[in-house]
């Protein structure tokens, strides 16, 4: 998530509450957020370099670092590849430098938009003690066009997400 959390115009949900929303058709027309377009390989190389430098320092200081998912988890926004948009990307992250200090932030709404089984992802990261922070957010729609919803909207079974050890 090198630049921001991306949203387009808000939409209305239950009770006429205004909610944040995203439409990839609109967002793809936004200008570059940085000086140029970057490649996914460049972004991974830079991230790996940073993780290998910062994680040992975090270990020495007793700090745990958690990477936020790309929100929304689409391939490119503003000319920047969005690395953390899949289960495989997060697996790759924690393998760069295996350490208790190298972990993730688990945003349920964002992970539910990825093309992977969210419950399998939760189980995987819980077993490895890699989840530092959980955000309870529910969304309706698909990754390229969604809106945030109330947590109790049941697009995602929030109760089931607590059932992992």
What does each model-identified segment do?
Residues 28-37, 100-112, 139-149:
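Hydrophobic transmembrane alpha-helix bundles
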Residues 15-17, 107, 130:
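Glycan-recognition surfaces
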Residues 44, 76-91, 110-165:
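Gly/Pro-rich active-site loop or hairpin
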Residues 1-103:
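Active-site acidic/histidine proton-transfer and metal-coordination neighborhood
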Residues 65-67, 102-108, 132-136:
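Hydrophobic faces of well-ordered beta-strands that scaffold small-molecule active sites
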């Amino acid at each position: 998530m090198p630049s921001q959390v991306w949203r387009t115009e808000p939409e209305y949900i239950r009770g006429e509450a205004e909610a944040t929303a995203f439409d990839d058709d609109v967002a793809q027309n936004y200008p570059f957020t940085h000086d140029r377009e970057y490649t996914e390989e460049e972004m991974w190389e830079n991230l790996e370099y940073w993780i290998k430098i910062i994680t040992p320092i975090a270990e020495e200081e007793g700090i745990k670092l958690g990477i936020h998912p790309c929100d929304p988890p689409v391939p490119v926004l503003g000319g920047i590849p969005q690395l953390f948009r899949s289960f495989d990307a997060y697996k790759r992250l924690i393998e760069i430098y295996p350490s208790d200090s190298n972990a993730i932030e688990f945003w349920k709404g964002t992970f539910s938009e990825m093309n992977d089984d969210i419950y399998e992802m939760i189980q995987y990261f819980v077993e490895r003690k890699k989840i530092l922070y959980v955000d309870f957010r529910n969304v309706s729609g698909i990754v390229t066009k969604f809106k945030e919803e109330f947590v109790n909207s049941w697009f995602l079974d929030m109760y089931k997400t607590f059932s992992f050890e």
